[in-house]
Structure formats: structure tokens, C-alpha cells
Amino acid sequence: MKKLNNRELFNIDQELFNFRGIDRAIWTRKAELMAKNGDDLVGGGKSGISKPTENTVMKFATDVTLKNLELFKETVESFKKQLTGEQLDIFYLRWGQANLDWEEIAEKQFVSNATIYRKRAGILETYARMKGVL
């Protein structure tokens, strides 16, 4: 099985930082889509009843950015279910609100730096497998 090199580990590490603000990003994107723009007035010859709810649902269903944000959230949520208790603690210390660096996490977990970096590699490789990178 292929192992991730340091650059790939770093990139996945940075990608997981986006999870902290994913709910806000999804909410913001939905608000942008719901905002009125002039697109609804195109073809103005029809005097039918407008369907704002249907239009909004269609915008949500067809927006690629929103779909990608929701897929990322779903992927990370299912990834978290695969982690052990200790790995989940490390996940929240690193990519949760705590935002600690690896040396600080090693101190909190009472392990050496080498051990925490091995655990980091294991966590990131699990995520890479879920994404299909490995």
C-alpha cells in the first residue's frame, strides 16, 4: 500500500482545517443563492405565478459549490466515525476549536513528538483512504 509523503500529509492537514468553518460556509452559500438577483425576471412575457420556493430549491440542487461543501462535510463526518477515541481527541485538538500545533497536542496527550507524528500520519492516511487518494 502506498504511503503519503510529507507534502501530501501537509496538504491533507491543511484541507481538514476547512472543516472548522464548514457550517458557516454552507450557510453563507445558501444565503447567497437565496438573495434576490435579476435572473428571475428573464422572459418577462409570462404572467404566471412565481414559485420562489421551487426556484430556491432548484438553485440549491444545481449549485456545484454548495454540493462540494456539503460533500466535504459529509466525508469528514463519516471519517470521524471511523476514528478511535484517542484519534478523535487528537482530531478536535488539531482541527477543532482548539487549533493546537502537533507539539502542543503531544504535550496534552503525554506522548513524544515522534509518537504524535506517527498518530498524525495514521489519521491523515485514514482520511486519504476515505477520499480515494490512497
Predicted regions and their residues:
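N-terminal interaction/assembly modules
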Residues: M1-K80, V133
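Helix-turn-helix DNA-binding module
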Residues: A98-A114
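DNA major-groove recognition helices of helix-turn-helix
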Residues: I116-M130
